[in-house]
């Protein structure tokens, strides 16, 4: 077959299709011999004739839903803006006034509320104030017991190291060791008196130099504690 067969077949197909749309209106894309091709003249004319009919509020297309559905016409939706505009300045002024009032309240009451805040270091440390019992965690107690097993008395440097390691204060470490020493002495005193009673002719034991040093150090610690308070 020659190529002319395909050309003639396609041409006949398009001409047959065009016969179906003989009554269709020419659009801006049609290229009739008498059509104007300068600018957008034909296109503007085609759309100008259809747009008013579709988007006109007064057309029957829009009148029928208003009348049948709500019993209202198109005029009910064309409300004037004056009734709303006259309330806007007052509304805006009220909102601005409320915001200003709130800002003034924050400025006035902010420092007053901040002044009522009491931090731990601001609390009074008078003799009338009752101190709560310090509670130690299991880990802190275990570490303190291990330290007490090796050293019943701590130097200032070692006390600071333990305080930093256990997240405690030097005062808490000091008080814990004081209480632990008193408990240890009481336990050993009871153990020494429990087995046998002291004979009547027995000479009272003389305190050793170590016991005296311990007592003097305890007295010094108590004096330091009173001075700190």
Curated annotation (Swiss-Prot):
Annotated GO biological process: angiogenesis; anterior/posterior pattern specification; embryonic skeletal system morphogenesis; negative regulation of cell-matrix adhesion; negative regulation of keratinocyte differentiation; negative regulation of leukocyte migration; negative regulation of monocyte differentiation; negative regulation of transcription by RNA polymerase II
Regions of compositional bias (Acidic residues) in chain numbering: 213-229
A molecular function (GO) term: DNA-binding transcription factor binding
Keywords: Developmental protein, DNA-binding, Homeobox, Nucleus, Transcription, Transcription regulation
Coarse class of the protein's main subcellular location: nucleus
Chain segments carrying region Disordered: 186-229
Localization (cell): Nucleus
DNA-binding region: 129-188
Pfam families per record: Homeodomain
Stated role: Sequence-specific transcription factor which is part of a developmental regulatory system that provides cells with specific positional identities on the anterior-posterior axis.
Family in the record: Belongs to the Antp homeobox family.
Name under which the protein is recorded: Homeobox protein Hox-A7
Gene label: Hoxa7
């Amino acid at each position: 077959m020659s190529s002319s067969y395909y050309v003639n077949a396609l041409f006949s197909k398009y001409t047959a299709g065009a016969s179906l749309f003989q009554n269709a209106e020419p659009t801006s894309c049609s290229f009739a011999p008498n059509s104007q091709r300068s600018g957008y003249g034909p296109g503007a004319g085609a759309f100008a004739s259809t747009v008013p009919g579709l988007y006109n509020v007064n057309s029957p297309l829009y009148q029928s839903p208003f009348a049948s559905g709500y019993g209202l016409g198109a005029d009910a939706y064309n409300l004037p803006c004056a009734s709303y505009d006259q309330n806007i300045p007052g509304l805006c002024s009220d909102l601005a006034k409320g915001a200003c009032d709130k800002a003034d309240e924050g400025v006035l009451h902010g420092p007053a509320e901040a002044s009522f805040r009491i931090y731990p270091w601001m609390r009074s440390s008078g003799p009338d104030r009752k101190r709560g019992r310090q509670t130690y965690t299991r880990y802190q107690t275990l570490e303190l017991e291990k330290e007490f097993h090796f050293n019943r008395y701590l130097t200032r440097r070692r006390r600071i190291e333990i305080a930093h390691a256990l997240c405690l204060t030097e005062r808490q470490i000091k008080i814990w060791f004081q209480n632990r020493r008193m408990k240890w002495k009481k336990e050993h005193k009871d153990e020494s008196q429990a087995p046998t009673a002291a004979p009547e002719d027995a000479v009272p034991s003389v305190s050793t130099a170590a016991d005296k040093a311990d007592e003097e150090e305890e007295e010094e610690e108590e004096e330091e504690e009173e001075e700190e308070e």
